[in-house]
């Protein structure tokens, strides 16, 4: 049995292609310990000056202490997981703000990464990540969502990353059906190898 953290970030609820794919993965991984964090249904606070002070580990005010406690909770969930499932739809060529905010709260010096003489080093090594990406159009792997997710996960030490794409969903119902079927086939392959 494995610990799995599922991050949903779509604002579209049950209509979301990435949420539907995340639910499909959850169904396939029954029997594991699964924690689901829906960043749209359970929004994180806006990452502002108080949050930046808090995640540096220097909280002084009550608000900053609460933000540090939130960051600690998010990091604990992440540290406990062996596998991370992330729903990452493309909104205006990038990830949703909810997902960006999540990484702002968990990317903490000396906790999830550290600076060394050779540059930054991620501290959350040995984890797997499966990214569920949905795009209205057709994009190659150089798109911003893929590049950002590879970069931020690598920054915190997660380098075993696989991508599942549902592309062209903006082309209509037939395209959605085809994209979902293709994505589910890829998910089946990945889950079988876990």
From Swiss-Prot:
Named cofactor requirement(s): FMN
Alphabetical list of Pfam families matching this protein: Flavodoxin_2
SUPFAM superfamilies reported for this sequence: Flavoproteins
Catalytic activity field: 2 a quinone + NADH + H(+) = 2 a 1,4-benzosemiquinone + NAD(+); N,N-dimethyl-1,4-phenylenediamine + anthranilate + 2 NAD(+) = 2-(4-dimethylaminophenyl)diazenylbenzoate + 2 NADH + 2 H(+)
Coiled coil: none
Cofactor-binding details, from the entry: Binds 1 FMN per subunit.
Binding site for FMN: 10, 90-93
Superkingdom of source: Bacteria
Alphabetized GO MF terms: electron transfer activity; FMN binding; oxidoreductase activity, acting on NAD(P)H as acceptor; oxidoreductase activity, acting on NAD(P)H, quinone or similar compound as acceptor
Entry's EC annotation: 1.6.5.-, 1.7.1.17
Keywords linked to the UniProt accession: Flavoprotein, FMN, NAD, Oxidoreductase
Family note: Belongs to the azoreductase type 1 family.
Oligomer and partners: Homodimer.
Record's function text: Quinone reductase that provides resistance to thiol-specific stress caused by electrophilic quinones.
Name the record gives this protein: FMN-dependent NADH:quinone oxidoreductase
Biological source species: Haemophilus influenzae (strain ATCC 51907 / DSM 11121 / KW20 / Rd)
Gene behind this protein: azoR
